[in-house]
């Protein structure tokens, strides 16, 4: 058999599809990398929508960027990508076959809502009488049995919680069915088993935050103002239970003195049997302490009790020094008792300082910096995928193959093989996608689809009709800028025929609405006043193209970085500057003309400069992908 026939034979047996289990930031990144590389991707998520833990965060370290601002474009891209099939409310039951030709056995749970009919109007949730604890807000408030996880979730389709639905449990109610204008409720929906053929599997199920309720001396669950770090993220978030206002749970008063306690659920064999460092807790505590001051009305005291500050990442030490310069107090101590403050509010903390003095100090709130543990379903997932776990129930991987599981053709990324922060998780996700793509190089493009290029409308001779979309960005912009006043001002500008203000302009529902408005209003210029074009411009341009508009008829005003952030304590100046930025963007939009991009032939040959371990690994993986590669070493 010739080598050409051998390749053909291999291609016939290799499936050009990959299953990614887990819809957090790592799973999303792996799915996008593979889908953009010519593979069909099944993105499997056990909850009703993708986003994972990152969607719950207010900000990300070390830059303190808005977490949703970074995540939302990726959510929308995942949802609209023609080579990614989202499979929500679905779990992996087993994997049979061998690398290159697996059969994944999936268990899909009922949503009780037909996603092809649901218009996400929210009437089902509004009319639903059943309230349950809201897991997305860490149990700090309530949601309905008919719900979406959060406002920017993808797919933006409601689901009915069968474990709490009155009709499913007791045979009464059906209010959601009665009021649904689209007839999307389907109580006949059943659990089903689905088999899909894939060539490789990537496991990105995320992690579980350590539950400190078993450590009674912290008072968690008994003292209202002792909260976990994830609960505190939801307190700070503009989409959280307190709408971004700094408040303690006991009486919703603004705390003036907050303590963070490090290494809860980490670095302790005796207390929790987790001897490892969770690697993210030091930095997220610093981030929370610094960001709390921005949410406070003033006079906030922040104290971080620690054993060691492990600020090991890029610019992490700078963030640590910056926090100290801003007045965050760092105490090397391990508090050993917590009791409720006067009238059950606040927390009295007893500790011994570095000089050996015993101190009792009253705080308005205590935040437990909980560590990262393996997902609760790690054992079941490992058995289904046929891989091994380590003693902490993380996926067992080699130090020299950190994304390769013990079974050939199965890869892991994110925090499933051990605690990681977001940048590390994204790097691991791309590495896992690269490895999977290398395995399936013979079948690249076999199952993927290319979008049809739609001709843009010719608006070159039409008078400008500008649409201006003003983003609140949660509280990132609206917490400082009077967005209603800016929106009203934009409507008075020459050429503007439509204005709108949205909570998150980058969310899927607003993107769909934007495309609809472009068609209905005949808009031929678009201005978005939001955050940075570096991350969001491509998203809005894709929406314009989908609506039949040339993507270069777009202008963006960065009223977050250039107004609300730099004038955080000067709302009047921030609002006036936002008006100026919008006026400038509209003036420029009036002068925009459609542009076309030339098509260039691609030379599919790679050059790697540097023959160290990184360069050699990159060259080997590129060649495994089927690309001729030159490696240069001086």
Q: What function would you assign to each model-found segment?
A:
Residues 1-634:
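Residues forming the flavin
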């Amino acid at each position: 058999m010739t080598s050409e026939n051998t390749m053909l034979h291999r291609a016939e047996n290799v499936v050009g599809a990959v299953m990614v289990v887990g819809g957090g930031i790592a799973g999303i990144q792996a799915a996008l990398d593979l889908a953009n590389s010519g593979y069909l991707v099944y993105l499997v998520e056990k909850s009703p929508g993708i986003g994972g833990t990152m969607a719950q965060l207010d900000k990300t370290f070390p830059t303190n960027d808005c977490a949703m601002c970074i995540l939302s474009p990726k959510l929308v891209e995942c949802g609209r990508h023609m080579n990614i099939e989202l499979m929500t409310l679905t779990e992996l039951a087993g994997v049979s076959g061998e690398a290159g030709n697996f059969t994944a056995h999936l268990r899909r749970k009922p949503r009780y809502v037909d996603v092809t009919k649901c218009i996400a109007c929210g009437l089902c949730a509004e009319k639903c009488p059943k309230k349950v604890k809201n897991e997305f807000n860490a149990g700090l408030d309530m949601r309905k049995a008919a719900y979406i996880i959060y406002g920017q979730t993808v797919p933006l389709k409601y689901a009915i919680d069968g474990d709490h639905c009155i009709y499913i449990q007791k045979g009464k109610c059906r209010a959601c069915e009665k009021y649904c204008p689209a007839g999307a409720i389907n109580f006949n929906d059943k659990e089903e088993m689905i088999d899909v053929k894939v060539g490789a599997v990537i496991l990105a199920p995320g992690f579980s935050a350590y539950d400190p309720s078993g450590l009674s001396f912290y008072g968690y669950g008994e003292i209202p103002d002792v909260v976990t770090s994830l609960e505190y993220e939801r307190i700070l978030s503009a989409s959280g239970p307190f709408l971004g206002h700094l408040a303690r749970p006991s009486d919703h008063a603004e705390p003036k003195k907050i303590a963070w306690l490090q290494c809860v659920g980490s670095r302790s064999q005796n207390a929790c049997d987790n001897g490892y460092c969770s690697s993210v807790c030091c930095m997220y505590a610093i981030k929370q302490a610094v960001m709390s001051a921005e949410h406070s009305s003033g006079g906030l005291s922040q104290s971080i009790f620690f054993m060691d500050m492990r600020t090991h990442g890029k610019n992490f030490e700078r963030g640590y020094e910056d926090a100290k310069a801003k007045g965050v107090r760092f105490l090397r101590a391990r508090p050993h008792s917590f009791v409720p403050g006067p009238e059950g509010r606040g927390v009295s903390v007893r500790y011994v300082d570095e000089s050996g003095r015993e101190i009792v100090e009253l705080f308005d709130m205590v935040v437990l910096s909980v560590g990262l543990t393996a997902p609760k379903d790690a054992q079941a997932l490992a058995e289904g995928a046929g891989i091994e776990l380590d003693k902490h129930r993380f996926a067992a991987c080699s130090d020299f193959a950190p994304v390769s599981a013990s079974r050939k053709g199965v890869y892991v990324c994110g925090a499933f093989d051990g605690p990681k922060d977001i940048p590390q998780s994204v790097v691991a996700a791309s590495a896992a996608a690269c490895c999977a793509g290398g395995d399936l190089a013979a079948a690249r493009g076999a199952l993927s689809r290319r979008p049809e290029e739609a001709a843009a409308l010719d608006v070159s001779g039409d008078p400008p009709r500008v649409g201006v979309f003003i983003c609140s960005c949660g509280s990132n912009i609206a917490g400082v800028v009077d967005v209603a006043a800016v929106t009203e001002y934009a409507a008075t500008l020459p050429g503007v025929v439509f204005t709108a203000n949205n909570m998150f302009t980058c969310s899927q529902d607003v993107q769909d609405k934007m495309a609809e408005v472009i068609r209905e209003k005949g808009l031929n210029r678009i201005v978005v006043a939001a955050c940075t074009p570096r991350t969001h411009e491509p998203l809005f341009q894709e929406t314009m193209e989908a609506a039949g508009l040339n993507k270069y008829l777009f202008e963006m005003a960065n009223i977050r970085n250039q107004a609300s952030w730099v004038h955080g304590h000067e709302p009047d100046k921030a609002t006036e500057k936002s008006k100026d930025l919008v006026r400038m963007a509209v003036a420029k939009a009036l002068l925009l003309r459609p542009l076309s991009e030339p098509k260039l032939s691609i030379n599919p040959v790679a050059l790697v400069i540097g023959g160290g371990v990184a360069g050699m690994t990159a060259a080997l993986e590129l060649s495994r992908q089927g690309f001729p590669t030159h490696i240069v070493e001086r």
